[in-house]
A protein has these predicted regions:
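Transmembrane-helix signature of polytopic, membrane-embedded enzymes
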Residues: 64-82
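Membrane-interface alpha helices of multi-pass inner-membrane proteins
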Residues: 123-137
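Aromatic- and kink-enriched transmembrane "portal" helix at the membrane-lumen/periplasm boundary
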Residues: 41, 78-95
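Juxtamembrane membrane-water interface segments that cap and precede transmembrane helices
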Residues: 29-39, 188-209
Length: 257
């Protein structure tokens, strides 16, 4: 019954997913919300929830426009379900904000296949990834995805390869200016850069282990179908699928680090 209900794409499906995401968002944050019921706190939680919904909407748009899945609403359904089994993904504001900017960056990279406004898209993608790293440092690893995209879409002009670094320099200037105006000091790289740590003690929680195990099992299972589908696609469509696959590998690397 659920399968037949979500096998098409309708606005009502997004409404249902929005309501369900609101429920699990409030459920996992109930202790924080009840601890401080001031207007400022409630507005902050609601603003972060809007960030979550905006991320889901962009992801749905990205998948639909590039035909990354069949015409159905299962992509957003599974996204919210996976968020629901990893509580920390909904509790940490920085992770939600970083995720939004990474999704925006991936959207710009996938759109490179049109070969229109290439320089602007490369700049935007690098800039969004840089902003994401301000909230969660290891999001900077997605910067590598830009060069994967340039190779996939055969973007070979030397100037284009400089643009992503230019975007980071612009972001650094903006961050430094903000620090000087607000904190009366230069941008603190020591507090920004995190060291590599393979300490997995944070994953010792039983519920977290179960959630991650479910996601990994599902990912491995779906990869067989995904890779098979890539081989059957024409080149122009195949590149988008391969790019998403690279993004998946980078995401797993971030989880380990």
């Amino acid at each position: 019954m659920i399968t037949s209900f979500f096998k098409t794409t309708k606005p009502f499906h997004f409404v249902i997913v929005t309501l369900f995401s609101f429920f699990i968002f409030c459920y996992y944050r109930k202790d924080f919300i009840l601890e401080d019921l001031s207007l400022a706190s409630v507005v902050q939680h609601f603003a972060i929830y809007l960030v979550l919904i905006f991320s889901i909407a962009i992801q749905a748009f990205l998948v639909s426009k590039n035909n990354l899945t069949q015409k159905s609403s299962f992509n957003i359904v599974f996204l919210v379900l996976f968020l629901g089994i990893i509580p920390s993904s909904l509790i940490d504001n920085n992770i939600l904000l970083a995720n939004l900017f990474i999704v925006l960056a991936i959207r710009r990279l996938v759109s490179l296949k049109s070969n229109i406004a290439v320089k602007k898209k490369l700049f935007d993608a690098a800039f969004w990834i840089g902003i994401a790293s301000l909230f969660y440092f290891w999001a900077i690893l997605f910067f590598v995805l830009i060069f994967f995209a340039m190779l996939l879409y055969a973007i070979g002009h030397f100037k284009n390869w400089i643009i992503p670094f230019t975007a980071l320099i612009v972001l650094l200037i903006c961050a430094t200016s903000y620090s000087i105006l607000v904190d009366n000091s230069f941008f603190d790289f020591n507090s920004y850069i995190e060291t590599v740590s393979f300490d997995l003690s944070n994953y010792n929680k039983f519920t977290l282990v179960i959630g991650i195990s479910i996601i990994i099992s599902f990912t491995i299972w779906i990869l067989f179908y995904y890779i098979k589908k890539i081989k059957e696609l024409v080149r122009i469509k195949r590149t988008s699928y391969v790019l998403i696959l690279y993004a998946l590998f980078i995401a797993f690397a971030i989880v380990i680090i």
